[in-house]
Each structure stands twice: as C-alpha cells, then as structure tokens.
C-alpha cells in the first residue's frame, strides 16, 4: 500500500472514532448516531460489562443522565492500522442524585475530571470494538466515595 492510501485509511479510522466522541458530548448527545457508528456485531467493553446491539447507547446515556454537560478532552490519539488508542479526561458537573446499592448520593454540583484510556477497533468504516477504561478510583474519590476497607476485612473474616 502506498503512503497516500495508508494515510487516508488511518484518517478515516480516526474520523470514525472522533464522530463517536462527538455524538457522546453533553451538548450533542446523539445516542442513535453513536450506535449507528458500530458494526452489527460491535461491542463496548466497559469495566466489568460488555454491551451489544440496542444496549450500546446505554454507556453514553448513563453518564449523560448524571452529567449533562459531559465532555471528553482528548489528550493523545494514536492510530495504528485499524486501531485507535486515546488518552483522555472525562469532565462534567453532576446535576443530581445518584442511586447506589447503599442509598442515594447527593452529588449536585460535584465536578468530574477523570482520566481514561480508550481503545477502538474499526473495520470497514464501523466500530467493531470499543474498550472504555476509566480511572474508577479517581472518579469515586472526586465524588467523596472512598473504599470501605473495614467492611471488606469483616466480610472476609466472617467467611472463614
């Protein structure tokens, strides 16, 4: 492949990923447009769960629900063939309460500025796989949620 063709392919792959980020911006929030960028068998791997089909939009809808001004600041974008790696910060302001297994957190006005690293695999102009990696510990600390090591130690002792 000559350099010109390779550059066009790389640029097209990056453009698909940038369109996905744009569709997920708080001031845009085009969930269907985001989903339409994925291949029919496309998948999002986010933390401990994977999402496919109609559930692809849940990932962006979930954060937008609590941070309607969500913005992803892209610090570094690296393209290698059909793979795009992105170092970013996810920023926004929480606009309301968040339900948790332990009760409701009142987070109105809390600021979010969490680092992350995403890896995208694009085939035939469509996203085949998106691995979303967010520094969950940093995010929780910013929201005043800290690990409860005492409960973990007690639960482990009780299980013996």
Regions found by a protein language model. Name each.
Residues 96-107:
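Short, surface-exposed loop/helix-turn segments at secondary-structure junctions
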Residues 11-15, 31-96:
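A solvent-exposed, acidic/Ser-Thr-rich amphipathic alpha-helical stretch
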């Amino acid at each position: 492949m000559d350099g010109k063709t390779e550059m066009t392919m790389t640029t097209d792959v990056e453009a698909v990923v940038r369109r996905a980020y744009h569709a997920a911006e708080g001031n845009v929030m085009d969930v269907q447009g985001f989903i339409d960028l994925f291949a029919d068998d496309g998948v999002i791997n986010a933390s401990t769960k994977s999402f496919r089909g109609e559930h692809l939009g849940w990932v962006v809808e979930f954060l937008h629900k609590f941070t309607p001004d969500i913005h992803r600041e892209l610090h570094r974008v690296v393209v290698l063939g059909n793979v795009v790696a992105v170092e970013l910060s996810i920023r926004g302001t929480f606009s309301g309460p968040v339900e948790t297994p332990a009760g409701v957190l009142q987070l109105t006005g809390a600021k979010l500025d969490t680092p992350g690293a995403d890896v995208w695999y694009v085939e035939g102009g469509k996203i085949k796989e998106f691995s979303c990696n967010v520094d969950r510990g940093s995010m929780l600390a910013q929201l005043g949620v800290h690990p409860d090591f005492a409960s973990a130690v007690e639960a482990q002792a009780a299980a013996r």
